[in-house]
Regions:
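Membrane-proximal helix-turn-helix segments that form the acceptor-binding/catalytic region
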Residues: 83, 123, 132-150
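Active-site proximal beta-strand in glycosyltransferases
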Residues: 91, 107-127, 149-151
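Short His-centered aromatic/hydrophobic patch
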Residues: 94-100
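Conserved donor-binding/catalytic core segment of Leloir-type glycosyltransferases
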Residues: 193-217, 222-227, 240-241
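Nucleotide-activated donor-binding/catalytic signature segment of Leloir-type glycosyltransferases, i.e.
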Residues: 253-273
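Aromatic "clamp/platform" in nucleotide-sugar-dependent glycosyltransferases that forms part
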Residues: 294
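A charged, aromatic-enriched C-terminal amphipathic alpha-helix characteristic of glycosyltransferases
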Residues: 335-338, 349-387
Length: 389
C-alpha cells in the first residue's frame, strides 16, 4: 500500500504516527509538508518527504491580500506537486486540515483511489476561507462528501447535526503518546520529579495550559487565582508552571512574570525545547493542571496529564472530550473559568481526596493511549479502504 500523508512532517506526533504505522503494516509512506524542513531529526520514518516552504512573500506586508489569496496559492502548489510527482496513491490522507485543502477537492481523485481526512476539532471552530468561516465550512462539507473516511474523535451529535452525511464514513482514531509509554515505565515519584525540575518537593505544582499559545488563557486564569480571597493562605504552598515552549510571545510571557512576581509566586517558565524525558518528568511532577483553552482537539498533553494521575480541571466546551468520559477517566469538569478557580481551591483544601479520585487514570491511559494500541484503529481503516493493497 502506498499512502500520501499531508501534514507537518516536522511534528513529533506526525513522526511517531508514521513510525508506528510502518511497524504495524506493510506501507510505503510519502509525505507532503507545506512547511519548511526544521531539521529537527537526523532521519525521518518516511519513504519520501517533500517540504514545500513557500510563503506568500510578495504580498506578506499587505495583510488582506495575504489572508485572502494564500489558501489558493497553497492549493495550487500542492496541485503542482501531485502533477509533477505523477503517482497514483492508494490513499491520500489529510492528517491536518488547512483552508487550502478544501479548495478544488475533486482533483484529488485523479491522484488517489481513496481520500481520508482527519478532524481534530479546531478545524470546525476558527478556520476561514475568503475571510468567511461559513464559506470555509461549506467547502469542508464538500471535502467530507468526497472522502471515503473521516477519522478522528468528532463522533458527537453536534458534528453530525452539521454534517449528517459524514456519519457512515466516520471512524474513530486518535494519536498515541510516547510520553505515556515513558510514564508507564517511570520509577520516579512525583516528589523525585519535582526535585529534578528544581522545585521543592512539598510544593503543590500547578500547570496552566500546555503551550505558549494565548488561547490557553494563562493570564486570565492566573489573575483569577491571585485575586481569589483564599490566595494569601495558599500562595506559599504553590508553584506555578508555564510550559511555553511552542508559539509564545515575549511580551506575553513578560506580563505573566510581572503578575507572578508582584504576588510573590514561586514559578517556572519553560520556553526552550523539551525532550521526551523532560516532558515525562514535567507530567509526573504536576499536581494540578488547568485546561481552559478556547478550543482543543484532545491534545496528547491532556492524556499525558491523566496518565500521570494529575488532577485535571477542564472546561466542558471541548467537543472531543466525550472520549475521555466514555473511557472512564476521572477529572473535574467546569462550566466557566470562575468555577474552575473555585474548584481549584477546593482541590488545595482536600488534596488527598482528589488524588484518590484520579488514581485509576494511569492504568486506563497506559492501556488505551500507547502508540502500539492507538495505531490499530488507523491500520484498520486503511485496510478496509484498500483490502487488496
Amino acid at each position: 500500500m502506498r499512502v500520501l500523508l499531508v501534514g507537518d512532517a516536522n511534528s513529533i506526533f506526525f513522526v511517531h504516527y508514521a513510525d508506528a504505522l510502518k511497524k504495524a503494516m506493510d506501507v510505503e509512506i510519502h509525505v507532503y509538508s507545506p512547511f519548511p524542513n526544521k531539521q529537527d531529526y537526523q532521519s525521518y520514518p518516511y519513504d519520501y518527504v517533500y517540504f514545500d516552504d513557500y510563503l506568500l512573500k510578495k504580498y506578506s506586508d499587505i495583510r488582506f491580500v495575504s489572508w485572502f489569496y494564500e489558501p489558493y496559492v497553497e492549493r495550487a502548489r500542492f496541485g503542482r506537486f501531485l502533477k509533477k510527482n505523477g503517482i497514483k496513491y492508494d490513499i491520500i490522507h489529510f492528517q491536518w486540515i488547512m483552508p487550502a485543502w478544501v479548495v478544488c477537492q475533486k482533483a484529488y481523485r485523479k491522484y488517489a483511489d481513496k481520500i481520508c481526512i482527519t478532524l481534530w476539532g479546531g478545524e470546525l471552530e476558527h478556520l476561514q476561507l475568503l475571510r468567511s468561516h461559513n464559506y470555509y465550512l461549506t467547502k469542508l462539507g464538500k471535502l467530507i462528501k468526497l472522502s471515503d473516511a473521516v477519522i478522528g474523535t468528532m463522533a458527537n451529535q453536534g458534528f453530525f447535526d452539521r454534517f449528517p452525511f459524514a456519519k457512515p464514513i466516520s471512524r474513530y482514531g486518535i494519536y498515541g503518546s510516547s510520553i505515556i509509554e515513558k510514564l508507564s515505565q517511570m520509577s520516579e515519584t512525583r516528589e523525585d520529579c519535582k526535585q529534578q525540575m528544581g522545585i521543592s518537593a512539598d510544593k503543590i505544582t500547578v500547570v496552566l495550559g500546555y503551550s505558549g499559545k494565548m488561547l490557553h488563557n494563562h493570564d486570565k486564569i492566573l489573575n483569577d487565582i491571585v485575586k481569589h480571597e483564599g490566595f494569601k493562605d495558599v500562595v506559599d504552598k504553590l508553584h506555578f508552571i508555564f510550559p511555553m515552549s511552542r508559539n509564545f510571545g515575549a511580551s506575553y510571557c513578560d506580563n505573566l512574570e510581572a503578575v507572578l512576581k508582584q504576588n510573590g509566586c514561586s514559578y517556572s517558565m519553560i520556553k526552550g525545547y523539551m525532550s521526551d524525558d523532560a516532558v515525562a518528568c514535567l507530567r509526573k511532577a504536576t499536581d494540578v493542571m488547568f485546561q481552559l483553552s478556547d478550543f482543543d482537539g484532545l491534545s496528547n498533553s491532556i492524556k499525558e496529564c491523566l496518565c500521570a494521575n494529575s488532577v485535571l480541571i477542564s472546561g466542558d466546551w471541548f467537543p472531543t472530550y466525550h472520549v475521555l468520559k466514555d473511557a472512564g477517566f476521572k477529572y473535574l469538569e467546569v462550566h466557566s473559568r470562575e468555577e474552575a478557580v473555585d474548584v481549584f481551591y477546593k482541590v488545595i483544601e482536600n488534596q488527598q481526596y482528589y488524588y484518590d479520585l484520579v488514581n485509576d487514570n494511569k492504568n486506563l491511559a497506559t492501556q488505551q493511549y500507547s502508540w502500539t494500541e492507538c495505531i490499530k484503529n488507523w491500520v484498520k481503516v486503511y485496510k478496509e479502504l484498500c483490502p487488496e493493497s
